[in-house]
Structures are given as structure tokens and as C-alpha cells.
Amino acid sequence: MPDRLVPATLAFRDDGTLISPEYGDIYYNVAGAFAQANYVFIAGNRLPARWQGSRTFTIVETGFGTGTNFLATWAAWRDDPARCERLHFVSFEKHPFTRDDLRRALSHIVAGTTLSEQATLLADAWPPAVPGFHRIEFEGGRVVLTLALGDARELLPKLVARADAFYLDGFAPAKNADLWSADVFRALARVAADDATFATYSSAGVVKQALVEAGFAYRKMPGLAGKFAMLVGEYAPRWRMRRHEPPRALPVAVREAIVIGAGLAGCALVERLAARGWHVTLIERHAQIASEASGNPAGVFHPLMTRDDNVASRLTRSGFLHALARWRALEHAGHTFARSTRGMIHLAESADDFVRMRDAFDALGAPADHVTLLDADAARAHLNLPVAHGGLLFPHGGAVWPAGLCAAQVAAAGERVTLRTGTEVARLERDGDTWRAIGADGATIAEAPVVVLANAGDAVRLAGLRHVALQPVRGQLTLLPPGTTAPLPCPAIGDGYAVPLDDGTLLIGATFEPDDVDPEIRDAGHLENLARIRHLLPGLVGDVPDVDTLRGRVAFRWVVADRVPLIGPLADEAQAVANARALSGAKARDLPRTAGLYGAFGFGSRGLVWASLGAELIASQLEGEPLPLERELVDAVDPARFLIRALRGRKLG
């Protein structure tokens, strides 16, 4: 069962001080939120001096609250001409404010300061109150906030990051002892960089003890506004106890990469790498980008929901929310593409299916700006069509034109991308620290220290992978001409889907035919799609022309055996097999990897949901940045997971 998030209660004392009724404590010192942020946390960590000249600098905070420490740090970064190239701020919050309450709190706190603009941007970008990591970018991606919504005791051990500074800012230890526990400090030590610093307003004995036990050295400093003392210090363990060191940037002489495959996965990678200053050669075997499954007229876009909030649910939720944020950023930058904005409804296929939806909805407790449960009457009213059962309404779900999205992402990369269409890679070769993409004629197409395979089923061949289970699945969609269907106000899915296009055409589909590689449109596929949509939405489809006159399209999804994509660094399978005995109990982090070789493929029918998140994950891995997902979700998409299972079961091929 997921841990439901309980929002914070907005409350003020008579003197205007913001308080937490849940914890019986104030949010900031009487001297003011920004005075505390600047004196205790920014100066206490010797900032901005410590981030100057760095490529990336990462701050981890234990309690986000109203975000004033983040806003003050952002302002300090903005005012520093020698600032780091990219500032990451990771913060944990068990009880996030709603967007409206955050906006009200910040309008009160920033009054009379120069931070109104940043406060507005933060509130505008505030995510829905659902568990997990939420990544928000500001300053064109140079200031990155990762909000970890949930209990820090559970989420901190799942953080993959190298922290340069810590802001220890929960409510007082006497009010919220859990956030100052030994487990929390051990989790902080696990992600601490060698020269990491910390600062906290508290000088309580339990805090000092927990710091020392976790390997931190502290010293007292005068507190703010008459407070006797605060603590600052460094990570200075007496001995090394970490099995795995925090991540570092891939050591490359030049920030150049080759991305093979210009569909949703590849184009998202181009945009994310270019945003970090990488120059990318994008290689596509077809004459234009988005020519295979990404060339469909539209694709539906929504998260899964299950009562137990399993891996697929958490991954699709993270991917859904991350993609929305990235798409809005693209649109804000002027790179527009067609997508529906009227929401999407997921209809139950049976009474039992509706019960499962209701149980999942109740378990998550998500707010209405993320999902709403509709009974059959409400679903009928929403669609203005007869339906047998209710479903889930996702107000930000819908349909997207994939090729337009791909074009927008390539355009956003600007001069940092070199596009090579009509070019097929026959093999990859590595010479020292350089990868070469070689054509059928033996000529080098491109070279770079990093290659990312985003070319669906062909990735397995190019990488020589033997322990990846991929299957082609044929999908045929049908286009019903204008005037043959009733109006549909938004995309609807269930056993099949229906998407109204701007020209009045209705897209329905799609067949699911494993191991069928026939590219030709078949009448049987049209009939199957029609039967499915007539069952899902009786009354939507009227008389249609002869089936053999209908237009459609065939594309192939590449599906992984466990229905989870393959995203991340590729394993060195030969070395792993040679050391199979030693690796029989290995975790993902223990496996040898092929230097500079990554993959983003096996997205099945969820390319729109997973492509942006997968690109952000790989870009973060390359740069040694905090990862946008919890550790077990990173492991869940690791391309080496099938190799790990083979090693454990001693079933190496």
C-alpha cells in the first residue's frame, strides 16, 4: 500500500509567524525566514564560495517546509557571477503544502523582499501531492529542485546522489524526533561527498550524538537572533564503511555523445544532453526522425494506478509527471507541438475492474489535480456517451503527436545536435576511450566517448546483449473519417483507445500481436479495433465505410518480458560471465559496465510516459547528478537486471 501524503495545515500566530499545528513548532526563527536561511544554512555551509567554479553542486535538505531555504539559495546562486554551472537542491517533505496554501504562505513570507518572482515560479511549478521524487527546473535547467515527497526516513536511503552540503532543517528534535534519528544521519553519510559540509540551527545533544556516530565532525557557532548556538561541520569519518561510493560524473575528455535512434527515446536524450552542454550526433536509419512507432498520428499518455502502488505504477507516475514538466518547459521556450489539454478518461472494462480502480484511487489518496474517480453516471456525463462502467479521469492526461514532440526536442537542442538521417549503424567499435559508429561500408559515421542506444529492438544486436528479453509486438491503428463518429470530448482508453484528432478524424486502436512482423495493414486489424471500441464506448462509432477503404498504420512496439523499460548503463556481459561465481549474489551496483555505453529502449506502448524520464536518468548518470528516481526504481529499469537474475540462478547463456 502506498503511504498517503497528508498535506500541511497553513496556520499563523497572531503576530504573523507561520506555525505547524501538527508539530507545534514554528517554521523559521523570529528573525525571519530569509535571515535564518542566509545565516544558518548558506553561510553555515560556506556558500557561495564552495560552489564557485564547480560543474555541479548538490545540496540535500531534510525539511522543505515553505521552500524559503531553497529560494534564498537560488537567490545567492543567481547573484554570484562565479556560480556553479548547475545547482541541484534535493529536499524531503512528509507534509507538503497544497499549491494554494504554499502560494499564500510565500506571499506572506516574501513580502518586502526581492524574491516574489522566484516564489511565484516555485508555486506555479508545485507538483501534485503524490509520493515520490518530483524534479522541477528553473533558470533554463541550471537550478534544479528535486522534491522527495514522503517520509525522509524511508526516502533518504533510496536517494542516489553525491551531496556537497546538507541543510538540516526539520522541526525541533523535541517536536519531530524521527527526522533527527540515527538512521537519518547514516543515510546522509551514505551520500556525502568527501568534503561535504552541514549546518543546522539545532545544538541539541541528540543531534550531536547522531552526527558523530554517522561520521560527521561538528563545532558550535553563535545562533541567530539571540539563540545560544547552532552547529556546522564536515563529513569526516574515522574509517570508511561504505560499500558503494556516491556517484561521480563519467570521466570524459569532451562532452560528446552518439545517440542511435531518433524516436521518442532518442530525441528526448538529445534535448536532455544538449541542455547540459553536450554535443550529440543523432543517427537515424530512416529518412526522417520519428518514422517508426513514434510516427503514429497520436499516442495516449497516462499513468497506471494499482492498490499496492507497484513498480509499474510508481514508474509511470514519475514518468507522467516528469514528461508534463518537460513538455511545458519546451512550450515555454517556444518549441510547441500538438497535444490535447482536455484530460483523458480510463474506463473500467468490468464491474470488478472498476472496484480495482476504486481501491487504487482510495489507497493513493491523490488530489483532484492528479486524478479523479468517476462512477458510471459521472463518466457518461463527462463523455456524453453511454458507458457501462466508471473510470479514472486524469485531468493532465491525454494524447500527444509524437513526431511533433520529437521535432520540438531536436529544435531545443539547437546547434548542439548533428542529425544524420538515412544512416544505418552496422556495428560499434571501441578504441581506447572512444566509441565509433561504423556503417555497412566500414566507414566511421561518428565517434564520441559515449553512445546511447535508443533504437528499440536493434539495440540488442548492436550491444551484443545475450541476457535481455525483448519481443516485437505488432500494433495496427485505425483512422475513422470525420462524420462517422459521435463527438468525443477527450481521449478515452480501456480495452482499446479512442483519440479525437483536430481534423475530425477518430483514431482507434490498437491491435496487440506478439511476434507478428507483418508491416501491411490488414482488414482484420480494422475489424478488431472497431469491435473493441464499440464495446468500450457504445454509441461512439456509427456507420463506417467499407473496412478495406479505411486508413490506418502499423508500427511495432518492443516489449520487455517484465513490461518495464531498459534504461541506463549497459553491463559488460563477458566480464560478468567470467566472474560469475563472485557475482552470484551481486546487486546492480556491483556489476561491471561497458564504459560509455548506455541504453534507453524496450518502452513498449509507453514511450510518451517513459522517454523524458529515461533521458533525464541517463543524463544525470553521465553527469554524476542526483538521480530523478528512487534507488529501487533505478534498479527496476536497469538493463542489466536480467543478467543479475541469470547470475543468481546460475543460468548464464
Swiss-Prot record:
Residue ranges of the region described as FAD-dependent cmnm(5)s(2)U34 oxidoreductase: 260-653
Question: What InterPro entries does the record tag this protein with?
Answer: FAD-dep_OxRdtase, FAD/NAD-bd_sf, MnmC-like_methylTransf, SAM-dependent_MTases_sf, tRNA_MAMT_biosynth_bifunc_MnmC, tRNA_MNMC2, tRNA_S-uridine_synth_MnmC_C
- This protein's UniProt keywords: Cytoplasm, FAD, Flavoprotein, Methyltransferase, Multifunctional enzyme, Oxidoreductase, S-adenosyl-L-methionine, Transferase, tRNA processing
Keyword Flavoprotein assigned to the entry: answer is yes
Q: Which GO terms describe its cellular component?
A: cytoplasm
Set out the biological process GO terms recorded for this chain's protein: methylation; tRNA wobble base modification
Q: Where in the cell is it found?
A: Cytoplasm
List GO molecular-function terms, semicolon-separated: flavin adenine dinucleotide binding; oxidoreductase activity, acting on the CH-NH group of donors; tRNA (5-methylaminomethyl-2-thiouridylate)(34)-methyltransferase activity
The protein's required cofactors: FAD
Reactions catalysed, semicolon-separated, are: 5-aminomethyl-2-thiouridine(34) in tRNA + S-adenosyl-L-methionine = 5-methylaminomethyl-2-thiouridine(34) in tRNA + S-adenosyl-L-homocysteine + H(+)
Stored HAMAP family: MnmC (MF_01102)
The name this protein goes by in its record: tRNA 5-methylaminomethyl-2-thiouridine biosynthesis bifunctional protein MnmC
The source organism is Burkholderia vietnamiensis (strain G4 / LMG 22486)
Ranked from the top, the taxonomy reads: Bacteria, Pseudomonadati, Pseudomonadota, Betaproteobacteria, Burkholderiales
Q: Which gene encodes it?
A: mnmC
